Structure formats: C-alpha cells, structure tokens
Amino acid sequence: MVCGGFACSKNALCALNVVYMLVGLLLIGVAAWAKGLGLVSSIHIIGGVIAVGVFLLLIAVAGLVGAVNHHQVLLFFYMIILGLVFIFQFGISCSCLAINLSKQTDVINASWWVMSNKTRDELERSFDCCGLFNLTTLDQQDYAFCTAVCKSRSPTCQMCGEKFLKHSDEALKILGGVGLFFSFTEILGVWLAMRFRNQKDPRANPSAFL
C-alpha cells in the first residue's frame, strides 16, 4: 500500500501520539524526580510542569484512541485542541526568540521580587551568587542576608542578575527552538488527523459514510 493510504496515515498518527505520550510522561517524571531530590521546592513550578505533562498525555491518548478506532468525534476535537495549542506555543516560541537583553533584565527583576525568600535563597546557593543587580536599597539588603558559599570565600560575590542574564539568552533560544519544532509537529498532527478522518476505512461497510 502506498504511504498516502489509510493504513499509512493511521500508523503515522499513532506514532506521533506515542511520541507525545512519551514526552508527557517524561515531563511528569522529571518534575517528580526534581521534587524528590529537592532540586526545586516551589510547588508552583513543579505543579506547572506536571500539569503540562498531564495535558499533553491526555491529548496524546485522545489522538491515539481516535486513530486506532477511526473515531470521527475524537479526531475532530483532537484537531481543534492541537490547533489551539499550536497557536499558543508558536506565539510563545517566537516571543522567546525575539526578547532582547533589556526585556530579559526587566523580566528577571520583576520575577525576583515576587519570589519567596526561600526560593531566592535556593537560587543564590545554586548559582553561588548574592543579590540581583545591586541597584536599589532592597537589592543591597538582599545581598546582606545572602547565604551563598561565595561570601565565605571572598568579600564580594558576583551578582545573581549577571549570571541569570548570561544563561537566560541561551536558555530562551533553546526553549524557542524546541517550541518551534514541537509547533510544527503539532501542525503535522492536525494535518494527519484531518487527512485520516476523511479517509474511508477499507474494512468498514462499503455503504457506510466514512
């Protein structure tokens, strides 16, 4: 059978959804592992990653069941949801690639002061730095209460903002690139689901509609 046939479309859609399932399980597993080892204590971060993993897993299961059973309703909603996810993810990925250092500084500064003291302390110890940018009285107070190891080795520590900026540009490019890649796999999933949904099952009753 040629690759444009019913079986090929079905197998391709199943394979794509198996990949989505593995990615969803990986996200859930990594979040649980990070929480178990104490690498990340913020319940909001862990909960967000797990929620994304569960959401991706549910979409993949719906797509897989729809593909295996040639279920018209499931495939329709799968196409709609995956299309909406593509629009959202494509926009976020483009934003990650377009953000400049000035915007990154603003985002880091705003994020730093909405974090809990515990989260800031963990970041300072993890990156071995103290304070953010030392631009305000609050920054100086934050530096004074820092518990990073670098304070015991030298009279001054590198500011955390400098280290964050150094890594954030690379991280944003990686996130943007990975996001764009998955965005195009989602478009592929929508196209495969639409194509497969409109194909007639050769094993079905010849007089039945699709």
Curated annotation (Swiss-Prot):
Organism for this UniProt entry: Bos taurus (Bovine)
Chief location category: membrane
GO CC field: membrane
Top-level taxonomic group: Eukaryota
Keyword ATP-binding: no
Transmembrane segments: 13-33, 45-65, 73-93, 174-194
Subcellular location(s) of the protein: Membrane
Protein name: Tetraspanin-31
Membrane topology, from the record: Multi-pass membrane protein
Database matches in InterPro entries: Tetraspanin/Peripherin, Tetraspanin_animals
Keywords in alphabetical order: Glycoprotein, Membrane, Transmembrane, Transmembrane helix
Family: Belongs to the tetraspanin (TM4SF) family.
Extracellular side: 34-44, 94-173
Glycan attachment positions: 100, 109, 117, 134
Residue spans, topological domain Cytoplasmic: 1-12, 66-72, 195-210
Signal peptide feature range: none
